[in-house]
Amino acid sequence: PDRAVGDDGRALGAYQIHRVYWLDAVEHEPSLKARGYEAVTDRAYAERVVLAYLSRYAKDWSIDTVARIHNGGPAGATKRRKATDGYAVKARRAFDEIKPNP
């Protein structure tokens, strides 16, 4: 999935990162710019991009909030909440499947 291309060629890598998402992350963490957008097909680099993006926009780091922001942009957890409902449910299910039992 690291070389995945989605959204009619507009999203790259396992995290399906769009160029505008990458630009927001780079603006928050300028050192990311050294590799360029196409490097989001490298999982380690893509994870740094996602963390920079979420660090910029997430007020809290709940699964619900970060999933909605990753999927719907900065307003994904607030104004565009309804548009990100499906993605948030999928993220919660995936998290619950991997979460260790106490």
Residue ranges and their predicted role:
Residues P1-P102:
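Catalytic glycan-binding domains that act on GlcNAc-containing polysaccharides
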